[in-house]
Structures are given as structure tokens and as C-alpha cells.
């Protein structure tokens, strides 16, 4: 069953009309302003680099995953969360809370999602709205809500309530993925979810695409290997390319009946694809799957181009490299052997490559990445892009050692503001995981 409220007809700040049953469980609090942390710099850090701690106190704070679309395009405001790890927060945790960080106001943190069960926020491309989900599901039962709120916290509205099978299917979605993705025109939003009934091992996962103007949802892809999809809309403003979504397929994964991942990949590992948001034009990215090169599972589009970047691990030569590629027609799950697939090693000029998590800016000019040795706190490096498909990354420079333990819950996960002037990262250097930012590099 679906309940639609066309949000253009809903009165401004009617927040109580469609609030989750658990919505009042969170007691919202304002955060503090950012704190200078020049003590994190070392002798090799560039002159003029400034470091700030954005969250403070005994309660953990973290950035959303680096591919999440959580910034306003003017680079002035973005989302982060408290009582969270580098990979998300607990949906039944009353302390887990999302904030808007206002960088023009000294990093002031203002609560933006008051309901418990809030997950997967995305900021609209025009910076006006935050879309998010309230997940009240369990495998085979429950409901979820797609909501919208103004970036200033006003005008909260329910776009769509889903409390039955997805249209045209027998699947009920549950365990919504912690990251959603929104199209460059702000008209469509996608998220993956578990589709199992809670009784069957290795059940399907699927990709849902929401039409934000019509308040409808469509299942465009499903299967048992889509457990960790990392779906990312192209940032291109081209009418056709704007419908492309980058997705990850985890071959050899093992899933229990509840949808929990018991084994992430097997055999030759994951591969990366591109699909149109109507479920057509399924393509390959030319990475991994040859027995030597393996996709780490971190990838993103290169600015607004049709090139994308992934981090790989190879057996020979031993390393973790950054490879950009361009999609080619699907020819089986053959990865880098895909006929017509274009590749470019962005790290070929370096003596060693130990890269993992990375991101670029909105225009595809600037780049930031973490790098090993991760058992010594890790490193954060910045670089500049050249011509897509031809040049290696250049202008490499070391920024700092974030002094993180680099455990899964405290991964550094660096990313850039849309304008490329600020870099953001996580660290538990204080003994508690917190969110940080840098500028002046």
C-alpha cells in the first residue's frame, strides 16, 4: 500500500502530520562551533594549512560516507551526524542525530532530522532541501517513509509512505542502505534495500528509484549479489547522462535470512556497473575480475564527466591503485577485460600506491585521498586532475597524519567541498571518533 502526499500541496511546516511512530524519541540539541586543531599538523604539512574539529565531547561524531551528496553547491553548508561511526549510525539509537554544519557561522551544528530511524539523507542539487528516509522495516514487514525538509529545518513533509510490496512486485523493501543518491536535476532519488522475507538465505537486494515530482517508486534492478550497491547518480547535467547510476555488484557474497552480510565477496570479487535509472542500458566498468586486480569497493564519478574512479588492490605489482574508467557495453562480468572499456592509471607516476578512500570536487579538478601506512595513523594526500582518460594525477602533496586507529568504525574517509577548497575527514585521535575539516592547502 502506498500513501502519497504531493509535497507541493502540503502546507509549510506541518511536521506532525506524517511523523514516524518513533519520531519524538530523539531529544534534539544544538551543537558547538568548530575548534581549531593546529596541533594535528606536523613538519611535513604545508604552510597555511588550517585544521578544525567539527564535533566535540564524549559522544562520537562522524562525516557521512564520502560519496554521499550532503553539501550545498555553494560549499557553505553540509550534513554530518553524531553517535555514529564512519559507516553510519544505529536506527534504534535515540542519540543518533543528523546536523547541518554551517561553515559560514563557524561550523555551528543545527539539528535537521528529529525522528529516530532517520537514514540516508541527500541534499538537493539546488541546496534547498534535505531528502531522507525513516526506516521502520524488518524483513518482510513494516514501512518506510521518504521525507523532505528545507535546509533550514522548516517545511518538513512526507513525500511517500511505503507499507506494502513495491509496485508491480511481491518484494517488500527493508534494511534501507545508509546512503541515497539524487539526480543532478533534483527530480529523482535512488536507494538500495534488502528484499528478502526474513526466512530465506541469499535473498535479493534491489535498487529503488523515486520520482520526486510524482511521489512514486519503482524497483529497477534486483538480485542476490546487490548487497552493497553504493549507488551514485551521475553528476552530469546532460539530459541523457543525468539518468546514469554507478552501482557495485558483490559476487560471491553470503547473506543470511535477515539480510545481514556474512561474506562480502568471493572468487574474483566485486565489479562495478552503470545502469540507466529506468533499469535499462546495463554496462560494465573496466575494473577488476581478472584474478589479479580486485575492486576495493570505493568508487565515484569524476566531477560531471562520464568517467569514474575506483581504488583497486593488485597481487602483482603489489599495491592499491587509483584507476579511472569509462563504461562499455555489458559483456559478462569480466571487469577490466570488457571489450571497449577505457582505463587510465591515475597513480602510475608514483613509486608506491597505498590508496583506499578518496573523493574529487564537483568540477573534477581537485582530489583527496587517504593512504597507508594505516597502522601508523594513515595519511591524507591532495592532488590535481589533468585531462580525463589521459593524464595521471599530479601536484601530489601531503597534508597531515590524522592519527586515527583506522579501524572500520574510524575509517578516515576524506572528501572535498564542491568547490575543492576544503577537505574533511574522520579521526579517533582523541580516543573518541570525531569529524574534522582542513582548508588552506
Predicted regions mapped to residue ranges:
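Beta-strand-rich domains and repeat architectures in extracellular enzymes and scaffolds
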Residues: 55-89
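Blade/loop signatures of beta-propeller domains
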Residues: 28-51
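N-terminal export signals
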Residues: 6-27
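Short, conserved, GDST-rich strand-edge loop motifs in beta-rich repeat architectures
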Residues: 83-93, 135-141, 191-203, 248-268, ...
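Conserved blade-ending motifs and adjacent loop-strand segments that build the rim/top face
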Residues: 347-357, 392-413
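Loop/turn-rich, solvent-exposed surfaces of beta-rich toroidal or solenoidal domains
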Residues: 311-315, 330, 348-389
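Asp-box/WD-like beta-propeller blade repeats and closely related beta-sheet repeat scaffolds
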Residues: 116-124, 128, 132-196
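Blade-terminus and WD-like Trp-Asp/Gly-His loop motifs, strongest in beta-propeller folds
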Residues: 69-77, 121-129, 180-188, 232-246, ...
Amino acid at each position: 500500500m502506498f500513501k502519497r502526499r504531493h509535497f507541493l500541496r502540503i502546507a509549510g511546516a506541518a511536521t506532525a502530520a506524517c511523523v514516524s511512530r518513533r519520531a519524538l524519541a530523539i531529544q534534539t540539541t544544538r551543537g558547538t562551533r568548530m575548534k581549531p586543531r593546529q596541533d594535528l599538523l606536523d613538519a611535513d604539512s604545508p604552510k597555511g594549512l588550517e585544521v578544525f574539529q567539527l564535533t566535540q565531547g564524549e559522544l562520537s561524531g562522524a562525516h557521512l560516507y564520502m560519496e554521499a551528496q550532503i553539501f550545498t553547491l555553494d560549499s557553505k553548508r553540509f550534513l554530518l551526524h553524531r553517535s555514529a561511526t564512519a559507516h553510519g549510525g544505529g536506527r534504534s539509537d535515540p542519540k543518533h542525530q543528523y546536523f547541518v554544519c554551517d561553515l559560514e557561522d563557524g561550523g555551528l551544528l543545527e539539528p535537521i532530522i528529529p525522528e529516530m530511524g532517520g537514514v540516508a539523507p541527500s541534499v538537493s542539487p539546488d541546496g534547498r532541501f534535505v531528502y531522507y528516509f525513516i526506516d521502520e522495516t524488518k524483513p518482510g514487514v513494516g514501512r518506510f517513509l521518504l521525507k523532505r525538509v528545507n535546509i533550514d529545518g522548516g517545511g518538513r513533509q512526507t513525500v511517500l509512505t511505503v507499507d506494502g510490496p513495491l509496485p508491480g512486485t511481491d518484494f517488500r523493501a527493508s534494511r534501507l542502505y545508509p546512503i541515497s543518491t539524487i539526480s543532478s536535476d533534483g527530480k529523482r532519488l535512488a536507494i538500495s534495500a534488502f528484499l528478502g522475507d526474513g526466512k530465506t538465505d541469499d535473498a535479493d537486494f534491489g535498487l529503488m528509484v523515486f520520482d520526486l515530482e510524482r511521489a512514486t517508486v519503482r524497483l529497477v534492478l534486483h538480485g542476490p549479489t546487490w548487497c552493497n550497491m553504493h549507488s551514485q547518480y551521475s553528476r552530469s547535467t546532460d539530459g541523457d547522462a543525468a539518468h546514469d547510476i554507478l552501482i557495485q555488484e558483490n559476487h560471491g557474497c553470503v547473506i543470511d535470512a535477515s539480510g545481514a552480510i556474512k561474506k562480502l565477496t568471493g572468487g574474483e570479487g566485486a565489479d562495478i556497473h552503470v545502469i540507466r535509472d529506468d533499469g535499462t542500458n546495463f554496462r560494465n566498468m573496466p575494473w577488476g575480475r581478472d584474478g589479479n586486480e580486485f575492486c576495493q569497493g570505493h568508487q565515484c564519478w569524476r566531477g560531471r564527466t562520464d568517467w569514474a574512479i575506483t581504488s583497486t588492490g593488485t597481487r602483482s605489482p603489489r599495491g592499491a591503485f587509483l584507476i579511472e574508467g569509462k563504461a562499455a557495453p555489458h559483456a559478462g562480468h569480466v571487469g577490466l577485460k570488457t571489450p571497449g572499456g577505457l582505463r587510465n592509471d591515475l597513480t602510475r607516476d608514483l613509486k608506491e600506491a597505498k590508496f583506499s578512500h578518496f573523493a574529487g570536487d564537483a568540477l573534477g579538478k581537485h582530489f583527496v585521498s587517504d593512504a597507508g601506512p594505516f597502522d601508523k595513523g594513515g595519511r591524507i594526500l591532495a592532488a590535481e586532475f589533468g585531462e580525463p582518460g589521459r593524464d595521471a594525477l599530479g601536484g601530489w602533496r601531503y597534508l597531515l597524519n590524522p592519527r586515527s586507529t583506522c579501524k572500520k568504525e574510524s575509517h578516515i574517509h576524506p572528501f572535498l567541498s564542491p568547490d575543492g577548497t576544503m577537505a574533511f575527514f574522520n579521526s579517533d585521535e582523541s580516543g573518541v571518533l570525531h569529524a574534522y575539516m582542513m582548508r588552506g592547502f
